[in-house]
Amino acid sequence: MAARNGGTIIDGKAFASGVRGRVASAVAGLEAAHGVVPGLAVVLVGEDPASQVYVRNKGIQTREAGMASFEHKLPAETAQAELMALIERLNADPAVHGILVQLPLPRHMDAEAVINAIDPKKDVDGFHVLNVGLLGTGQKAMVPCTPLGCLMLLRDTLGDLSGLNAVVVGRSNIVGKPMAQLLLNESCTVTIAHSRTRDLAGLCRTADILVAAVGRPRMIRGDWIKPGATVIDVGINRIEEAGRSRLVGDVDFDSAAPVAGAITPVPGGVGPMTIACLLANTLTACCRANGLPEPDFAEAGG
């Protein structure tokens, strides 16, 4: 973490590097002791430029961690039945421990049906309805990567989270809802806010933990934040400013940082944690598939 006048900047990039290092060490130990190599299959349908970048980065980091990387790139016009057949083959492949279908999918495909075709034990994104239900009932589940990364940063920053008031701004199935569930499982008092929430600013000011995942650039300002609160900014928004393109979060960092006790920047905060947690989930899936002890990455940063 880096100190700043008024608060601490949570260095997600450094923490993610620590997670990846722990994963790589565990993978090497797994191969040496048991001859097992975790395998991650990533499926990309279409030519979306952002998705291509994400898939390329995932492949690089998977291989750097010592895992097997299987990339399947399909044209945008691929029939859904063909994609389902590929998923069925990956489900049955013992060398593949994690399956990720890059979203968004082309419009003619039913994303929910595709995700739920993945074997829940290989669903390293944590989006399968079974994993959602397991998480919601406090049982062992594959946890979505971005909320898991946020939770790791919060634990590292605050230690015990029990009894803290947490406000999650955003109710998506990918971030908002699972984030709220993870915080509830940590014994926080959790409120989910969204675009219809009355007096959103006032609600945010009650939060000891404020998670912004609404997809609106710089929506949350410094005067919305309780002094000393920990702010986790999940937003990644590209804006044009002074003739240049730049990335900003859902939080107005310049006004929020002097008020917050700790805050994640954009970029360099939550973003790097997502792929690190994907690798951790893949390793976990491999250990479960082989009846081996699961590593604990709760305090893997630094």
Curated annotation (Swiss-Prot):
A biological process term (GO) from this entry: L-histidine biosynthetic process
Enzyme Commission number, as recorded: 1.5.1.5, 3.5.4.9
UniProt keyword Methyltransferase present: no
Single annotated GO MF: methenyltetrahydrofolate cyclohydrolase activity
Keyword Hydrolase found: yes
Keywords from the named record: Amino-acid biosynthesis, Histidine biosynthesis, Hydrolase, Methionine biosynthesis, Multifunctional enzyme, NADP, One-carbon metabolism, Oxidoreductase, Plasmid, Purine biosynthesis
Catalytic activity, reaction form: (6R)-5,10-methylene-5,6,7,8-tetrahydrofolate + NADP(+) = (6R)-5,10-methenyltetrahydrofolate + NADPH; (6R)-5,10-methenyltetrahydrofolate + H2O = (6R)-10-formyltetrahydrofolate + H(+)
Pathway: One-carbon metabolism; tetrahydrofolate interconversion
TM ranges: none
Any one cellular-component term (Gene Ontology): cytosol
Binding site for NADP(+): G170, R171, S172, S195, I236
Any Pfam family: THF_DHG_CYH
Top-level taxon of the source organism: Bacteria
Family per record: Belongs to the tetrahydrofolate dehydrogenase/cyclohydrolase family.
PANTHER family in alphabetical order: C-1-TETRAHYDROFOLATE SYNTHASE, CYTOPLASMIC (PTHR48099:SF5), C-1-TETRAHYDROFOLATE SYNTHASE, CYTOPLASMIC-RELATED (PTHR48099)
Summary of the function given for this chain in its UniProt record: Catalyzes the oxidation of 5,10-methylenetetrahydrofolate to 5,10-methenyltetrahydrofolate and then the hydrolysis of 5,10-methenyltetrahydrofolate to 10-formyltetrahydrofolate.
Name of the protein in question: Bifunctional protein FolD 2
Taxonomic lineage of the native organism: Bacteria, Pseudomonadati, Pseudomonadota, Alphaproteobacteria, Rhodobacterales
